[in-house]
Amino acid sequence: MLILALDTSGKMASCALLQDGVVLDLLQQDSQMDHSRLMLPLCEQLLQKHGLTFADVDVYAAVVGPGSFTGVRIGTAAVKGFSWAQDKPCAGVSSLQAMACGSTENGVLCCSLKARPVESFYALFQREDGFLIRLTEDKVGKDEEMEAAAERHGATVFLRDCQNAAGAAKAAWMQARSGKLQNCHEILPAYLRLSQAERLRKERMEQQ
């Protein structure tokens, strides 16, 4: 099974190819959040490097959040388009799970992304002998809440802002093996919190 995975949830745009559980290659570029312009050429470059086309891909995967709202929308829309055009299944992957899958360390992993100055997106996982188990759902909260959760679960490995498409491809492979792939209509962004515009609108409505 050949998986093409995209990650546009942060400043780095990346794409990766995975064949039967093994990452073949990873391309990434600091796009300064210009993912809409760079993502398609980056995918084409990766496929051409290995003598492949979009038609050769069996599963398309995207990091669907949490992370940059705009970036998440771009990656999700791209994979929806690839999946629809090629009539292939797809996988929506958590950025935090991608981070965990990209690590090889055993123990309890606390994976986090900066959300706001004093808030983080976070989730905890446990890996033993190559098996990854999710301990918590993806959450957003104050850094103190994340630290308390990490202490409660006995976290020994701390990963922050280091997700990429290679980890996303591994997470998609896990979904494929467990029969949890999606179609192009089912994959959706997972923001976890309101955008700034939505937050301001909500505050204005509450003040009226």
Place the predicted regions along the sequence by residue.
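Oxyanion-binding and handling regions
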Residues: M1-V22, D34, A91-Q208
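Short, well-ordered amphipathic alpha-helical segments that serve as non-catalytic structural scaffolds
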Residues: H35-H50, L96
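DPxDG-like acidic metal-binding loop motif
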Residues: V59-P89
